[in-house]
Amino acid sequence: MISIPKTLKQAALPVLMLLMGPGVARADMCNAKFFHDGGIIEIAGSGIFSINAKMAFSQVKKSNAEVCQAKVRGFANYSLMGMFTGANELDHLMLINGSKSSLTKIAPGKSPDAATFDLRMLNIFGYGAPIQSAGQRFPAQSFRLDLGDPSQATTPLTVRTGEKTVGARQSIQTALGQQSCWPVRYARNTDATVANLRGITIPVPPIQSQITDWFCPQANLVMKQEVEHAGQRGVIEVKSVK
């Protein structure tokens, strides 16, 4: 395992976050259990990467049931592909207006850099529109993020998620108890590239994964994400919601 110095933390974490997929808020997110001053979401996962993260909500303002905002702060400790380890602080502004949302990195005196960190890639907040029935589809997406030491030349990493397909609703066990949740299945792939780590060029192989998100309407969250990569399985779960 390689411990990443501080200059690499912001560059390595997006790779982990992009594996979790992009997401935006649902229209009823303003009334979610966690959307209040002092609200907390904790997640943990293992597999091709492991993660422990905590997000805290503060300065919550609600204009009505569909328009609200909050500061989202916290931290994430992670290990990716057995090569990258590190920790990052989370500091974002979350704005919700109906079925749309935005998450902006807070960086006083600097321009927010979505390529180095973007909390939207956690995907736990859903797909931007309510799930109505099995067979419903959400469009494919692609992203381009910088990989490598930001103090040196970086390499763009392309990530593609295939079309998402909703399966039949099922009852699953979650940290909030038994819930009726929608499975949302899709492929997620990254292209092969190279990254500069402490002045050493390291090849990064392509990553091809099959994903199943379990979106639970009662919680307004993807409470569990199952990841299959090269015959190995991993799980990312919401462990606590307050």
Residue map of PLM features:
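Acidic, serine/threonine-rich low-complexity disordered tracts
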Residues: 28-107, 147-242
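Sec/Tat signal peptide C-region and signal peptidase I cleavage site
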Residues: 23-27
